[in-house]
Amino acid sequence: MRMLIAGGGTGGHVFPGIALAEEVVGRHPGNDVVFVGTERGLEAKVVPAAGFPIELIDVKGLKGKGILSLLLNLLLVPRALLQSHRILRKWRPDVVVGVGGYASGPVVLVAWLLRIPTAVQEQNAIAGFTNRVLGRFVDAAFTAFPEAARHFAGRKVYQLGNPIRRTLMENYMRPEVKHPRPRMLVFGGSQGAHALNMRVIEALPHLADLREALAVTHQTGARDREQVEKGYRACGFEPDVREFIHDMSAAYAGADLVVCRAGATTLAELTVCKKPAILVPFPAAADNHQVVNARSLVVAGAAVMIEERDLTGELLAAEIRAILTHPERRERMARAAGRLGSPQAAKEIADVCAELVRRRWGSPAGQERPGHGPVRPPDLA
């Protein structure tokens, strides 16, 4: 089976796609996956680093733009459709999956016109604009939250969770590690989060009595690294401050509490890794979807949510103290998070895609069809 995964822009779209790709290529030696994205998106860097080929198209978002920007971006659509057609003819995929982001729109639409099986994977509780549009056409819509189902026709919705990377999935089966000191992991996404960084620093004076008992790993992004590290040291903490954490599996494994945003991929990782969390949703997220995402963990007892407008150093410190100084509460939250985890999401999504392939092409997933086999084009061999 050859799968084409389209979309990206942010890690929340890209990393579930990579997790699905890992599952597809890992289940059969004849399977392969190609991505389609844009030069500006995160996918242009992380997809090749993950070992997958990527094609780039010229397209920009249409939602939330001024009139001039909207008109200019609309002018790119015909070209993006032609580029998508060329890519689909070149790779001849058995199935096309859109993972959200504006790059997925033209590719999935052209695939549908070519009668190639199509699907979308919606990571959030409130479906994004592109997925809502594509949901009218595709053969399947994979969701992680029950709230997202209302955006798609019921017969095609599969609530299977968000795929996560294999290295993180290993944490689901890993026994709970008892650390000599509780460790707090703080991160705001791949670029960091300035507001979250600053509120954590403001919380430290209220946690000064815990400085010998608390270990901290903090991903700041490039902008705030120096200021954050100085803030910790001024309060007597010896933190592990980094611009970017490359091995999130190890970071999660070493954490007893996570303070972070509420993107869908982050929440999927928290639940599979069984980590209690203090969630600070990104206030500018489309349709306020991070708040809706976070509520599912809060209701289950796996997390505490503080909206950014309410976040102060004193309040954050109080929540950190209430969780880290009560091991029994941490354990309850960890168990609740684990019950929400979907470690088989990538496998189950790949299973449905394989069935779409069988129905359309009349051959088992991974089996070659005349004129189409699992061979990469010569320039990417």
Swiss-Prot record:
Entry's Gene Ontology BP terms: carbohydrate metabolic process; cell division; cell wall organization; lipid glycosylation; peptidoglycan biosynthetic process; regulation of cell shape
Tagged with keyword Transcription: no
Keywords recorded for this protein, A-Z: Cell cycle, Cell division, Cell inner membrane, Cell membrane, Cell shape, Cell wall biogenesis/degradation, Glycosyltransferase, Membrane, Peptidoglycan synthesis, Transferase
Subcellular location per the Swiss-Prot or TrEMBL entry: Cell inner membrane
EC number of this enzyme: 2.4.1.227
Pathway: Cell wall biogenesis; peptidoglycan biosynthesis
Enzyme class, broadest EC rank: transferase
Topology of this chain in the membrane: Peripheral membrane protein
The reaction(s) this protein catalyses: di-trans,octa-cis-undecaprenyl diphospho-N-acetyl-alpha-D-muramoyl-L-alanyl-D-glutamyl-meso-2,6-diaminopimeloyl-D-alanyl-D-alanine + UDP-N-acetyl-alpha-D-glucosamine = di-trans,octa-cis-undecaprenyl diphospho-[N-acetyl-alpha-D-glucosaminyl-(1->4)]-N-acetyl-alpha-D-muramoyl-L-alanyl-D-glutamyl-meso-2,6-diaminopimeloyl-D-alanyl-D-alanine + UDP + H(+)
Binding-site list for UDP-N-acetyl-alpha-D-glucosamine: 10-12, 124, 165, 190, 245, 290
The keyword Oxidoreductase appears for this protein: no
SUPFAM superfamilies for the chain: UDP-Glycosyltransferase/glycogen phosphorylase (SSF53756)
GO molecular function: UDP-N-acetyl-D-glucosamine:N-acetylmuramoyl-L-alanyl-D-glutamyl-meso-2,6-diaminopimelyl-D-alanyl-D-alanine-diphosphoundecaprenol 4-beta-N-acetylglucosaminlytransferase activity; undecaprenyldiphospho-muramoylpentapeptide beta-N-acetylglucosaminyltransferase activity
Organism domain of life: Bacteria
GO cellular component term of the entry, any: plasma membrane
InterPro entries referenced in this protein's UniProt entry, alphabetically: GlcNAc_MurG (IPR006009), Glyco_trans_28_C (IPR007235), GlycoTrans_28_N (IPR004276)
Function of the molecule: Cell wall formation. Catalyzes the transfer of a GlcNAc subunit on undecaprenyl-pyrophosphoryl-MurNAc-pentapeptide (lipid intermediate I) to form undecaprenyl-pyrophosphoryl-MurNAc-(pentapeptide)GlcNAc (lipid intermediate II).
Family: Belongs to the glycosyltransferase 28 family. MurG subfamily.
Name the record gives this protein: UDP-N-acetylglucosamine--N-acetylmuramyl-(pentapeptide) pyrophosphoryl-undecaprenol N-acetylglucosamine transferase
